[in-house]
């Protein structure tokens, strides 16, 4: 084998190895998620005319006390951590005679890499717990009990 032919074989082998390595990488969309912002929208659907007070926080951000009239909404935006399972926002909800909490955004549940992903996480807050909008079903049917257990 001539030197030139050996060089060409080496180039082809290296090229094939690079192609195989890149074929094992997930599509580039995973890289783009780190630049997207998620939006959480919370709507008062208590249904009895009660005002809903909520106070949402993460480990880094305190979003302050919000007061929602019946059917009123409030939204916030954030950039989830590029590290899976890290981003968490929890909210304390109160209305006459009640005090509840819920993880309104949990990367393990809502993150784009796992769970039931959402970029626009739209929540209706009812007396029995929060329900998230499903883009697949076009309905608020991803429901949880207070403090996080999924309802069937």
Swiss-Prot record:
Its main location: secreted. It comes from the Eukaryota. GO terms for cellular component: extracellular region. Pfam families: Self-incomp_S1 (PF05938). One of its GO terms (biological process) is rejection of self pollen. Keywords: Glycoprotein, Secreted, Self-incompatibility, Signal. The keyword Glycoprotein applies. Residues 1-23 form the signal peptide. Glycans are attached at residue 71. InterPro entries: Self-incomp_S1. The keyword Signal applies. It is found in: Secreted. Belongs to the plant self-incompatibility (S1) protein family. This is S-protein homolog 4. It comes from Arabidopsis thaliana. The gene is SPH4.
């Amino acid at each position: 084998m001539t030197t030139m032919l050996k060089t060409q074989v080496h180039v082809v082998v290296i090229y094939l190895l690079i192609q195989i390595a890149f074929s094992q990488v997930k599509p580039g969309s995973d890289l783009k998620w780190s630049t997207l912002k998620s939006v959480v929208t919370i709507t008062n659907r208590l249904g009895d005319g009660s005002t809903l007070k909520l106070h949402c926080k993460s480990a880094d951000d305190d979003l302050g006390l919000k007061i929602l009239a019946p059917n009123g909404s409030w939204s916030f935006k954030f950039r989830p951590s590029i590290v899976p399972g890290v981003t968490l926002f929890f909210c304390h909800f109160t209305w006459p005679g009640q005090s509840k909490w819920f993880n309104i955004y949990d990367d393990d549940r809502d993150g784009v890499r796992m769970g039931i992903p959402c970029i626009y996480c739209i929540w209706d807050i009812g007396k029995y717990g929060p329900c998230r909008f499903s883009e697949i079903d076009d309905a608020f049917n991803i429901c949880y009990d207070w403090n996080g257990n999924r309802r069937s």
